[in-house]
Amino acid sequence: MSDRVVLAYSGGLDTSVAIGWIGEATGAEVVAVAVDVGQGGEDLETIRQRALDCGAVEAYVADARDEFASEYCMPALQANGLYMDSYPLVSAVSRPVIVKHLVAAAKKFGATTVAHGCTGKGNDQVRFEVGIQTLGPELKCIAPVRDLALTREKAITYAEQNDLPIETTKKNPFSIDQNVWGRAVETGFLEDIWNAPTKDVYDYTDDPTFPPAADEVVITFEKGIPVALDGKPVTPLQAIQEMNRRAGAQGVGRIDIVEDRLVGIKSREIYEAPGAMALIAAHRELENVTIEREQARFKKTVGQRWTELVYDGQWFSPLKKSLDVFIQDTQTYVNGDIRMELHAGRATVTGRRSNTGLYDFNLATYDEGDSFDQSNARGFIELFGMSSKVASRREQGLAGN
């Protein structure tokens, strides 16, 4: 039996050509694996059949949308995962679930190697290969674009010469990656960081300059997970999809950033994540109501480190798993409702309520009914400022000598 290579298959030109390209370069049989994480487009059966028509000996497709939303997007939400305070890990958080299915397929079909379509200068090569090495240490990895010199021009020529059932003439000027958590756009004229994005860059969001009437939504959370919208129960996937639709219609979630890549270069990226950004804003505000101050301060540090690990392809690392435990513990009391207005590119919190919150009206009010004993303040201030007072006394004494 020939060696087998499992290929992360998208159904597009590059990975369709890679089936035959890998076979000719290595002599191995290719098993195509397509994972649906909410990227839209063609249905899985069409993609599966194309892989077989392009020469794959097996084609495995998986609808991982619910799994992706529940087991990957929700932890990112609970961590308030925003890389460089801006990017909600759109691509980074999808790679581990794809890796999981690639490794499972390799074991199922007896493959010794996993192939992916990443270049040698992006983050995804690291995310895929570190994940594969972790879950399937016996597996080898190859990247046709990086390792077998498969350029787009060669891919077009190969497809035409071999009559592959794939479109070769239409070329999008951008490199696009998308899933239910968001959409990433790069390359083309965007590589000049002075160039403003044009309208054709965007797909998940409408122009916020001319928005429809404001849209008010109430998001209900249990343990940091959205469980209802406007009182209607939803799954995590449904929550993201509905918020994508509603926030996207208002132009919420457009991000334009020069990003520090893992491989050491800076890259200009355009992201659209209407649902993710609105949900993170709502979740963060509910945490303000429900999490104790010192715990909240430390969680921000933990969340930032968690985000960096996921961005860097360390989803399966021991440290990330340990941080998961802390973050999950902080979510115990993150229950309640957030009212939010979506309008003109902004998701603005206008109300919050929680039965497990730490906000005490009687302590906070300045009106009648105030139960805060202000006489305690003087002693607190004296003790709180003691160390600074003593240090200042020392400095003044030394200055006088």
Swiss-Prot record:
Record keywords, A-Z: Amino-acid biosynthesis, Arginine biosynthesis, ATP-binding, Cytoplasm, Ligase, Nucleotide-binding
Cross-referenced Pfam families: Arginosuc_syn_C, Arginosuc_synth
Predominant localisation class: cytoplasm
Pathway given in the UniProt record: Amino-acid biosynthesis; L-arginine biosynthesis; L-arginine from L-ornithine and carbamoyl phosphate: step 2/3
Gene3D superfamilies: Argininosuccinate synthetase, chain A, domain 2, HUPs, Single helix bin
Gene, per the UniProt record: argG
Organism: Kocuria rhizophila (strain ATCC 9341 / DSM 348 / NBRC 103217 / DC2201)
Gene Ontology annotations for the cellular component aspect, listed alphabetically: cytoplasm
Protein name: Argininosuccinate synthase
Alphabetized NCBIfam families for the sequence: argG, PRK00509.1
CDD domains with a match to the protein in the record: ASS (cd01999)
